[in-house]
């Protein structure tokens, strides 16, 4: 496959990205290890926040902006934590039952947050693993502020009219309808469904204004990404496009410190993966 070059819209690095053959999970930044999917989500959030071509680490601090993200991975979460009122949560039933860490653990099928609490909710490759996904979408709609947006990626085929249901969840126990499929969480997280276009209709019925974007932004080495946006309002407002002249951030002596922060955050992710795999 031909090399892919561009600028990372998360850390600002410019150059040739590696593993372009891995599609959604590849085209990785050599500086911060963001994938094409990470950059696609950051790109959409940047468009919603009117940040243009600025990489995430140059976005202004706004602690009045409250963001909820499930199973956050990649380099952007540590930057979001510095800039916004950011809830990066994991699904851990034992921790959720304790109720001691509401900013770190949550069940999207039964969120413990107040109504109209968040400006943005992000779930990247999460909802194919949520047992009762419609409950989750309704909960997110409830906790979004009016005009707030839900940004989601899932394995999605826009050509498919109907979602493929892999597991019957109508009873207390899962009943497999197809060969079990696992990925994420060290390869131990069950996939309940493979989404088709009826997902958009479901979100619309709940009340969202819905948009589906097939994203290809060569300037940021974003390739073949489907992003779904649900806004708690009358319409989805996107977007400004990519300026011809990209930002040229000055990394300077702060680069080692930034890389340390990214490493520190991702250690938390690795620990969670290990615990999840052990529990399974």
Regions found by a protein language model. Give the residues of each.
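S-adenosyl-L-methionine-dependent methyltransferase catalytic module, highlighting the catalytic core
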Residues: 2-6, 131-145, 149-251, 270
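Short beta-turn/strand-loop junction motif enriched in small, turn-promoting residues
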Residues: 13-16, 75, 216
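A local structural micro-motif
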Residues: 16, 87, 210-211
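Aromatic-residue hotspot detector
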Residues: 17-20, 24, 118, 206-208, ...
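Generic detector of short, locally flexible boundary/turn motifs and exposed helical patches
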Residues: 31-33, 49-56, 68-69, 87-88, ...
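Conserved SAM-binding loop
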Residues: 58-171, 197-203, 227-232
């Amino acid at each position: 496959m031909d090399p892919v070059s561009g600028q990372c819209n998360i850390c600002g690095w410019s150059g040739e990205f590696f593993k372009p053959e891995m599609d959604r999970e590849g085209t990785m930044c050599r500086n911060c290890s963001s994938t094409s999917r990470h950059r696609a989500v950051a790109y959409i959030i940047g468009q919603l926040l009117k940040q243009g071509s600025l990489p995430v680490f140059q976005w202004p601090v706004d602690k009045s902006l409250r963001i909820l993200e499930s199973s956050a991975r990649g380099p952007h979460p540590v930057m979001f934590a510095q800039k916004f009122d950011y809830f990066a949560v994991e699904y851990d039933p034992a921790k959720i039952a304790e109720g001691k860490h509401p900013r770190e653990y949550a069940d999207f099928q039964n969120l413990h947050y107040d109504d109209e609490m968040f400006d943005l909710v992000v779930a990247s490759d999460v909802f194919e693993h949520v047992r009762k996904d419609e409950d989750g979408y309704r909960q997110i709609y409830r906790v979004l502020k009016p005009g707030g947006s839900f940004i989601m990626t899932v394995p999605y085929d826009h050509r498919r009219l109907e979602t493929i249901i892999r597991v019957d969840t109508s009873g207390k126990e899962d009943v497999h309808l197809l060969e079990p499929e696992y990925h994420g969480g060290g390869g131990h997280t069950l996939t309940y469904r493979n989404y088709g276009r009826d997902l958009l209709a479901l979100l619309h019925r709940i009340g969202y204004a819905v948009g589906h974007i097939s994203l290809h932004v060569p300037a940021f080495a974003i390739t073949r990404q489907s992003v779904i946006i649900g806004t708690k309002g009358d319409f989805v407002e996107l977007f400004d496009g990519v300026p011809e002249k990209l930002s040229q951030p000055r990394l300077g002596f702060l680069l080692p410190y930034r890389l340390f922060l990214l490493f520190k955050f991702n250690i938390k992710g690795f620990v969670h993966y290990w615990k999840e795999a052990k529990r399974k």
